[in-house]
Amino acid sequence: MPFWQKAEANFMPDKVFHYSKFLIAVILVGLVAALAIDVERHHVETANTRVDMAIDYEGLQELAQREGLPEDEVLAQAKDAGITSLAVYETTFKKLNENGKATAIAGARLLESYHDGTLTDPAWRSLVEQGKIVGTEAYVTGHDAQTYKEVKEDLIRRLGADRVTVLQAGSQEVLAVKAHYESLMKMNLGMPTDEMKKVNDAGFYVLARPSNYLKCTDDDVKAVFARLDGFKISEIVFSGNQTLGAPGALMATIDEMKHRNLTLGLIEATTQLQFYKQDGMEEIAKNLGYDRVARLYSIPKDEQPKLKIDTAVERWANTDMERNIRIDLLRIYDKPSPNMTLLETNMKYFRDTHDALAQHGFTIGPSDTFASFYPSKWLRGILMLGVAAAGVLYLSLVIPRLNASRKWQVILFVVFGLLAAVPVFMGAGSKIRVLAALASANVFPSLAVIGLLDYVRTKRDELAKHLIPLMVTAVIALFVTGALSYIGAAYLSGALADTEYLLEFQIFRGIKLTFVLPMVLVGIAFLQRFDIFDGRMDDTDGVIEQLKKILDMPVRIKTLIGLAFVGLAAIVFVARSGHTSGMPVSQTELHFRAMLEQAFYARPRTKELLIGHPAFMLAMMAFARKWPTMLLFALVLVATIGQGSMVETFAHMRTPIYMSFLRGIGGIVLGAGIGAVCMVLIELWQFVLAKAKAAAAKK
């Protein structure tokens, strides 16, 4: 039987579900509260638009050396190209040996030079002869007074005074250091004031990158910040896997940063989710205030050489727009582009990045931070009541006895409402908020689809059968259902929105569940309303009886193969969803995504425009033309993917709410277009088959 052949008895007309006006009213009141929170969130997000374009000072030094140019000339060009901050790291003996401001030499090498006659300085020969040169120690001399003073101070802090001894080589002071020479060469030796001065003098801010001390004390912390005094600092981003002061002197770090009103930069993790873990970072952020925290991203060192400049520039624009990154730590390209010098290549990269950010509404300078944003507990509590009402409304639409009893609906609402709202009204309820967000992401898109099913059941005979009117009806239905699903998006955002979620100190849990659960919820409701066996079930039968019949059905090998493919598709669908993907994305899809990013302010999600929304259009066609209900069931479940995805987009709280909103709209518009094309193709297919069948009948 062709799939478009009419199935006259594919729904259960006696099963009429009533929608509680009381519960709907509570949902609407909760929606007002949710929208109030969301509008406030939007204002907070639009006020945070300044991005710090930074690069390592060492990177520009390397670029100058590679091109054989004066450092000042390269710095000036970088400034003109849009760079605002230079990252300055702690100095090391490796760097000091190269710039000649201080030298560390192994005692074994001095002894070797003494014995082979190449150590000619009388003062040093005297130290050897006095037995003051030990082969297992290192000896430090300075050639710049300020640098030597800072190195001496930091060596004593890091190693202790008992491991650093002052010697005299004639009129020159020498430090004898009890340390493994190779380790000493790599040891951090404090923030170099000469580099910070040069950075400021060239017109840049300093992005300070201090590291922690072993058994760090309050005095160590104060010494680090004292060295930063007098310099223009844009942000502090700690180096290594510990913040300065961890674990015992964190309050000193917090106090020093508060005193100087400094911004803490935290490095986004390589998974592009939350942060690179540094001991003490959460305590500093919490006590400093989340309104003094900015997110930093840097394209991985091994990835950047594979990216063309325009691709990298697009990466920066998308990163800052979609993930609330406000410190862009760039790297230099170490190979020139065709027909360009290495300097020209990098200046083009900097300039194009600056221009792309400006085109997207960003200003360039020391990073902005989010204002302290914690919505009213009263608004949030009212929102929670709306979520409770939505949960009860769903239950009433799948449990006939509950649907018939207004009393039990109210009782359930009171119970759920108290459990959800009371902790929030008391100023707590962080876990309840997550559960409310999870419920919003699953229940509201399900209610939207169920509401459509109930509406079209009553209008089945009135639905247009001809293609163009049917297509228009399907598009209108898609937009209306999408608008209803967006109620869930408003609730989800309102339940979670605060500064900690915008910065990703907290994240929504249950992303992968939201791709599956709405289909389950809609599937249950569908089986309560429709006989998927087209008249072979009693009208009084519902979900359980239909599931039993499905389980009792004999299974053929081809059915098993088909189910295996469906299962594989489901695994791929879920694995590629969520904050982190368990499966790679093909190059073809990456190119398709890039095209969408160029065409739209916010790239629509492929699961909406290619899967969910076209299936929605076809489901309307299936219902109007009375295709087999089993096929309608499958299309409705797939259509639910699109509705759930629209809401789930808002679970990525780091993405601005306006961008998430436009992403969903773009998905509906494109998805409706693709769905319309699919409807036309099926219409043509049916026409061709009908012609062929008529021709065969004439023979």
Where are these regions (language model features)?
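Alpha-helical transmembrane segments of integral membrane proteins
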Residues: 3-4, 10-33, 385-699
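Generic low-polarity alpha-helical segments
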Residues: 1, 6-8, 86-88, 199, ...
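Soluble extramembrane regions of membrane proteins in the secretory/endomembrane system
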Residues: 42-377
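Arginine residue identity/basic-tract feature
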Residues: 18-21, 41, 50, 66, ...
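Hydrophobic secretory-pathway targeting helix
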Residues: 2-63, 75, 84
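Non-cytosolic juxtamembrane linkers/loops
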Residues: 327-412, 416-428, 433
